[in-house]
């Protein structure tokens, strides 16, 4: 079948993806081969494909396709994450549009809506990944709320609780008033923001004295339960044992003493609000202070807010300052830069809040995971992230794992009374009943007497088990799949979830398998625009990946994404990269169209130039293959692509095909053609991980193949010894060919016209390639001479001098005039450069690079003058 003139990406991509799916090439089963396993970082079930997903999944597909070609049993497990906060927010918003308030629904009713939403939107991003060419084992697709996955999470919670690692505590937590849930410390993003520092005067009870405190949050004075001073601060010695009065609410509070107060900072007086600040809570515990919580879960003030009850905290801030000013309590207001914690999910300003929550003790669990990275059992790529990882793991805090949400795994704690300890933890209510009866010595307890904790577990508490749970390794720890596929090989993910997810997976791996979950962690950079801004919907600077693939084809976009994506460094994305990728795909297509159009002659002998060209390219291929293997080994995927790109574009298309291409109207020798096809097939194998669609299309067009011979399951090229000398000699020969082409172009000598070439040979490096030089330069006669040739144009390549007789080809007088003018200009340029180099102040004062550049200019000018003089001598 004749090839289309233009590569039709859409048609070809659909054809081959369907073919791969129909023939089950992506599916893996346990067998005798060595496994190569990747688990996908599960995108949010609510998500659609963005540029970060494109980069991350292209990298994974490159690794998995290469492993498949290398003969490994390649298994790439896809799936999605239930994303508690994000999904619940979307469902609540949808219900609001429909006029339904979540508060009026039971948990079961709300979950029906959540599952409906999930079934409707959950598959979108995975379908989009298929357009990219992702060769996931779709039969293994997992969702973190699948029954098996959820059961694994519950089992782990119960196990860790019984080991004493999970506890329930009344602690200061990060509260997101928009999502109405707690967040872990890692889910809080701190940003420098400009605010105000308000100086407020508190009256001292029973006197005319006042104390001045400074606060950035004047609305919280309604929760103040003490003023703290340093016992060594002589300014306030007279206030020991006294009390102060909180403005507006007129609460009488003690003036306490504690060395925690820095006498040099602010006014030396500290307002203590134990319900709304972690440090204040510690002071409150130490001094037995009352706790007054002024906020509702949605960030509005409660009854302790007095006449501000029901108003948002930020509205109250403005109004309370106005009231305090009218009372004469505000002594001054200063602008102030300070760090403000915001929710990683909703962007809302976080409130420190005291709450009964569930926590996982991390210090002891984290140690094996820290050792694994420091001892290189788990490799972070690039290594610059090791110190960041170590710092976090050495300072790890207990993980708040409960969330005030309904969407997610419900915490398996069952309460049988009103006391804080009146609960049991069990995998199901039947088991919980037995435990509750034992704990209370009350066999009359019934399941109806038990109430399950309404909170859900943090989403990360399910995804930290991902490499184990996708193979059912929690529920069936000795099943054949977990024993075969675990530990996985490579994880490709973003540095921003190094702690949210990667570190915790390593912790879970050692806790539940006594083994690392993966060997290598490839940390991608952030995709940014040309102005170095992170791509985001809100900025409107992120192109739609589906639109990009429609325009440039999936292969083109894959190449574009990878051309500038070194591990751990940010990718400065420019759509021109996709254009370049598409151009590369078209180059491959046109190269094959050229080959496919050749007529083969079975009886024609292979020419010397063909033999040389094939020997050179095979060596060049093997040398590049070694470089590519090295890049893959070091996870320099963009470098592996660039080496492949240069080999195919420059060496194969621009040089090799020109060297073996039969002259116009002639046929190609059968032996040459077969060897060209053989090296083309090797090219397609190393191209396949990067451009799977076009490589499979060409592979299948070369000859009829059955399903076992598809490119996707072919064999990666074997490393072979290569001839460094022939590569070096070609580099020299290519200089000679370029010199001939330059003279033809400059002197308007048509390529159709044959020319003679004489070589004053001081270096024999080009002799092996004489046949190639003659073919590509259209040389009628190539001679080796011992003296310079008169009446000829000349150029140099290393120590060889080349002469092209020009009798009748050019106007000699015009050429002499032109060369004389060029010589004069070059001599003038040389004089100015040498003037600089004779100036001691310049040589001693300028940077080394600048001086070196001038010396290079001098050397280049001297060489050019010598060539021009030789050309003039030859013409006179």
Question: Where are the model-predicted features located?
Answer:
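Acidic, turn-prone loop/beta-hairpin segments
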Residues: 81, 173, 177, 184-189, ...
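C-terminal low-complexity, glycine/proline- and small-hydrophobic-enriched intrinsically disordered tails
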Residues: 579, 701-876
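Protease-associated
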Residues: 208-272, 278-282
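N-terminal catalytic cores of NTP/NDP-binding nucleotidyl/phosphoryl-transfer enzymes
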Residues: 29-91, 144, 153, 213-215, ...
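Non-catalytic terminal extensions that flank enzyme cores
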Residues: 1-51, 74, 331, 344, ...
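Residue patterns forming the tRNA-binding/recognition surfaces of aminoacyl-tRNA synthetases
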Residues: 15, 22-23, 92-210, 221, ...
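Alpha-helical recognition segments enriched in aromatics with Gly/Pro capping
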Residues: 259-261, 287-299, 405-408, 413-416, ...
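Metal-dependent nuclease catalytic cores in nucleic-acid-processing enzymes
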Residues: 58-75, 278-283, 287-288, 321-324, ...
């Amino acid at each position: 079948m004749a090839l289309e003139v233009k590569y039709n990406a859409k048609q070809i991509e659909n054809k081959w993806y369907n073919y791969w799916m129909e023939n089950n090439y992506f599916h893996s089963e346990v067998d005798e081969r060595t496994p190569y396993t990747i688990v996908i970082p599960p995108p949010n079930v609510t998500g659609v494909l963005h540029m970060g997903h494109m980069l991350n999944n292209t990298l994974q597909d490159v690794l998995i396709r290469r492993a498949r070609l290398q003969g490994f049993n390649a298994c790439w497990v896809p799936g999605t994450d239930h994303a508690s906060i994000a999904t619940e927010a979307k469902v609540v918003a949808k219900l609001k549009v429909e006029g339904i308030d979540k508060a009026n629904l039971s948990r079961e009713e709300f979950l029906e809506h959540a599952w409906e939403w999930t079934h409707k939107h959950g598959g979108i991003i995975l379908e989009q990944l298929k357009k990219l060419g992702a060769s996931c084992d779709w039969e293994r697709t997992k969702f973190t709320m699948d029954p098996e996955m959820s059961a694994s999470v519950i089992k782990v919670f119960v196990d860790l609780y019984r080991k004493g690692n999970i506890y329930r505590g009344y602690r200061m937590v990060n509260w997101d008033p928009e999502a109405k849930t707690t967040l872990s410390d890692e889910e809080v993003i701190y940003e420098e923001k400009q605010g105000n520092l308000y100086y407020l005067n508190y009256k001292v009870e029973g006197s005319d004295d006042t104390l001045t405190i400074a606060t950035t949050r004047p609305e919280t004075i309604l929760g103040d339960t003490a003023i703290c001073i340093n016992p060594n601060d002589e300014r306030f010695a007279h206030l020991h044992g006294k009390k102060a009065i909180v403005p507006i609410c007129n609460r009488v509070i003690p003036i306490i003493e504690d060395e925690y107060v820095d006498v040099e900072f602010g006014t030396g007086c500290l307002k203590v609000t134990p319900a709304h600040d972690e440090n204040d809570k510690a002071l409150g515990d130490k001094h037995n202070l009352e706790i007054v919580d002024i906020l509702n879960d949605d960030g509005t003030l409660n009854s302790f807010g007095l006449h501000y009850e029901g108003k948002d905290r930020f509205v109250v801030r403005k109004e309370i300052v106005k009231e305090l000013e009218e009372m004469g309590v505000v002594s001054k207001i200063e602008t102030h830069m300070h760090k403000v914690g915001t929710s990683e999910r909703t962007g809302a300003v976080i409130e420190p809040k005291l709450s009964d929550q569930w926590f996982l003790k991390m210090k002891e669990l984290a140690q094996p995971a820290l050792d694994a990275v420091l001892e290189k059992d788990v490799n972070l790529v690039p290594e610059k992230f090791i110190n960041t990882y170590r710092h976090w793991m050495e300072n790890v805090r207990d993980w708040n794992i409960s969330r005030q949400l309904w969407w997610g795994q419900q915490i398996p704690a069952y309460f049988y009374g009103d006391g804080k300890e009146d609960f049991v933890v069990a995998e199901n209510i039947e088991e919980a009943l037995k435990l509750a009866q034992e704990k209370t010595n009350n066999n009359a307890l019934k399941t109806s007497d038990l109430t399950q904790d309404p909170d859900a577990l943090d989403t990360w508490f399910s995804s930290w088990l991902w490499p184990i749970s996708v193979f059912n390794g929690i529920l069936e720890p000795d099943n054949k799949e977990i024993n075969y596929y675990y530990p996985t090989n490579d994880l490709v993910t973003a540095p921003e979830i190094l702690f949210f997810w990667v570190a915790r997976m390593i912790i879970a791996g050692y806790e539940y398998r006594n083994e690392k979950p993966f060997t290598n962690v490839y940390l991608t950079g952030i995709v940014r625009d040309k102005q170095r801004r992170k791509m985001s919907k809100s900025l409107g600077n992120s192109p739609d990946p589906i639109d990009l693939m429609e325009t440039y084809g999936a292969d083109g976009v894959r190449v574009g994404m990878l051309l500038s994506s070194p591990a751990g460094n940010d990718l400065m994305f420019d759509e021109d990269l996709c254009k370049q990728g598409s151009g590369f795909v078209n180059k491959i297509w046109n190269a094959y169209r050229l080959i496919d159009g050749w007529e083969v002659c079975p009886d024609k002998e292979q020419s010397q130039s063909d033999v040389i060209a094939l020997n050179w390219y095979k060596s060049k291929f093997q040398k590049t293959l070694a470089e590519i293997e090295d890049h893959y080994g070091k996870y320099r995927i963009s470098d592996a692509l660039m080496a492949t790109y240069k080999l195919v574009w420059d060496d194969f298309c621009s040089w090799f095909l020109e060297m073996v291409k039969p002259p116009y109207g002639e046929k190609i020798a059968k032996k040459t053609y077969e060897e060209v096809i053989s090296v083309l097939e090797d090219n397609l194998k190393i191209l396949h991980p990067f451009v799977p669609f076009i490589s499979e299309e060409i592979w299948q067009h070369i000859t009829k193949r059955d399903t076992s011979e598809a490119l996707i399951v072919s064999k990666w090229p074997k490393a072979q010894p290569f001839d460094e000398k022939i590569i070096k000699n070609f580099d020299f020969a290519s200089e000679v060919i370029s010199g001939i082409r330059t003279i033809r172009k400059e002197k308007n000598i048509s390529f159709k016209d044959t020319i003679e070439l004489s070589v004053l040979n001081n270096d024999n490096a080009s002799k092996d390639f004489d046949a190639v030089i003659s073919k590509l330069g259209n040389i009628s006669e190539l001679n080796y001479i011992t003296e310079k040739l008169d009446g000829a144009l000349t150029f140099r390549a290393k120590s060889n001098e080349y002469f092209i007789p020009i009798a009748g080809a050019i106007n000699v007088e015009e050429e002499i005039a032109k060369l004389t003018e060029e010589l004069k200009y070059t001599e003038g340029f040389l004089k100015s450069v040498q003037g600089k180099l004779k100036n001691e102040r310049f040589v001693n004062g300028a940077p080394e690079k600048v001086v070196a550049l001038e010396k290079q200019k001098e050397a280049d000018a001297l060489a050019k003058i010598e060539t021009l003089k030789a050309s003039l001598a030859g013409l006179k």
